[in-house]
A protein has these predicted regions:
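C-terminal regulatory or interaction extensions
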Residues: 1-253
């Protein structure tokens, strides 16, 4: 078993940070404590509801939990050197684990991954840390959608996998690529839930007013141009079009 490291930085770069060794109680015994530790160090925002002020976490706690669990379960224990690591920046959190994914990163949602650490996965399921194989990323995506965060970025390096969860960002500050990635994540999540991706659902995802439906159409077009989604039935009129992930056509065929 490799020890989990947690590093918190002062800003958005790695210039200056305090490293904390975590996981001394083991993955199962220390999982709850690690969640509490992260929860206490992540930023919160003050909101007002019914005249009452309260603080709400910037990052959805359920997404953090699933990303930590995935990082532990899917690490490659045969890779030497560093173990799982969580890095906290002012604008993002990075979760890094040894090893590269056993499936295409575009299929993290909707495809059951082969088990790399069967005994560890079964144990963590038995103690209530993880659930059915392949369901973690659906929960992460659902939380990202609910909180209208940018889509997580998955980076595969030579012997490591890194998932970046971004802090909330106004639609106007998201790049074209980030918007297309969010459209793709939305489309995949709805596809595996047997729901349609439409202009209406995209407007709801990004908080776009009904009178600005053309803006939602541009987002869908950009995602298609990027090769991420397809029109389900090209014979259907523009207003009634439904969209699916690019890989769904090959899957049906």
């Amino acid at each position: 078993r490799k020890t989990i490291r947690v590093v918190q930085y002062d800003g958005s770069s790695r210039a200056g940070g305090n490293e904390i060794q975590a996981g001394s109680r083991g993955y199962a015994g220390g999982f709850s404590g690690l969640q509490d530790y992260l929860h206490a160090r992540l930023p919160s925002a003050e909101i007002v509801e019914s005249g009452l002020r309260r603080h709400q976490q910037v990052y959805p706690q359920r997404a953090i939990r699933e990303l930590v669990a995935n990082m532990l379960i899917h690490q490659d224990l045969s890779v030497g050197g560093s173990g799982p690591m969580v890095e906290i920046f002012s604008n993002r959190i990075e979760f890094t684990n040894p090893g590269v994914p056993l499936i295409d990163v575009r299929r993290f949602i909707g495809q059951r991954p082969p088990s790399r650490n069967e005994a560890l996965a079964l144990f963590m399921t038995r103690v209530g840390i993880s659930e059915e194989r392949g369901s973690g990323w659906e929960k992460i995506a659902a939380e990202v959608e609910l909180h209208q965060l940018p889509a997580p970025r998955i980076t595969v390096e030579s012997d490591h996998t890194k998932v970046t969860l971004f802090a909330p960002r106004p639609f106007s500050e998201m790049s074209k690529t980030e918007r297309s990635e969010a459209v793709y994540l939305h489309t995949v999540l709805r596809f595996v839930s047997s729901e349609a991706t439409t202009n209406t659902s995209i407007r709801a995802r990004f908080g776009i007013a009904e009178q600005n439906s053309a803006q939602a159409s541009r987002l869908l077009t950009d995602a298609m141009d990027a090769g991420l989604i397809l029109i389900e039935d090209v014979s259907v009129g523009t207003r009634l079009r439904r969209y699916v992930p690019f890989w769904s056509v090959a899957e049906v065929a």
